[in-house]
Amino acid sequence: MIAEASRLLRPRLALLNGIAAVAGCLLAPEGAAMSLIVASLAGVTLLAAGGSALNQVMERDLDLLMERTRQRPLPTGELSPRAATAIGGISIIAGLVVLAGTGGIFPPLIGVGALAWYLGIYTPLKRRTSCSLLAGAVSGAVPPLVGWTITGGSLVDFRIVLVAGLLYLWQIPHFWLLQCRHAEDYRRAGLPLFAPGVTAGSPVFRVWIGAFAAGTLLLPLFGIIGGSAAPGFCAFPLLLVLLAFSRAEGALFSSLNLFPLLMVLALYLQR
């Protein structure tokens, strides 16, 4: 049961959301206590893991049709939908308790809102339109808001708005490339794909990468990332643009995956 629950919760993917929440903590001008950083990491990771589990319950019919997902515990019958729902619910409740216990009411409320959007808007929309990822990216941009509010930050502060906006921009090419990689799987499951001309090498994709790259440069420009971390951080968006125009999709996908970690590292180095 433990092994199946671990596969259901997808801890590595959930941890990326937790790391993004840490970015929000590290933005705090007066610095964040280690207890708040740990709480943000743990709470958001648990919420993301629980959300992933409930998403798999809702999409178990699709997962059975796709090569990359048919070995998940629900399609294989290793877990029942009821058991998976219970595991996901426990993870979500644990995450909310952690966030409420350290940050008051706002962090868990934001987390609940993100989960409701992800499961109530994105998951059903995924079956209807390829543009569903534009909606799904909203919930993926929320973790830094949780980390920021747990330190007492205001949601209208331009720094957290910029970081959350960058995470939104980052997710689109990331999942775009993922869709291109598994296009046959999506067709097999009957999920809508982007139009044939809209590929990783298309002008609209390059424009999006360019917008994301330009946005990342705003962090050093506004002093959000500075010191010794700034030069290396500025080199990252330039690398993305070069990879996008060279059509090195594998390298571009791998580089995009590093962005949340790179941002957290850069914010940590200037503390």
Curated annotation (Swiss-Prot):
Annotated pathway: Porphyrin-containing compound metabolism; heme O biosynthesis; heme O from protoheme: step 1/1
Membrane spanning stretches: 31-51, 79-101, 105-122, 133-153, 160-180, 190-212, 228-248, 249-269
Compartment list: Cell inner membrane
GO biological process, one term: heme O biosynthetic process
Keyword Transferase applies: yes
Gene3D superfamilies: UbiA prenyltransferase (1.10.357.140)
Note: Carbon 2 of the heme B porphyrin ring is defined according to the Fischer nomenclature.
Family: Belongs to the UbiA prenyltransferase family. Protoheme IX farnesyltransferase subfamily.
Protein name from the UniProt record: Protoheme IX farnesyltransferase
Organism: Geobacter metallireducens (strain ATCC 53774 / DSM 7210 / GS-15)
Gene that specifies this protein: ctaB
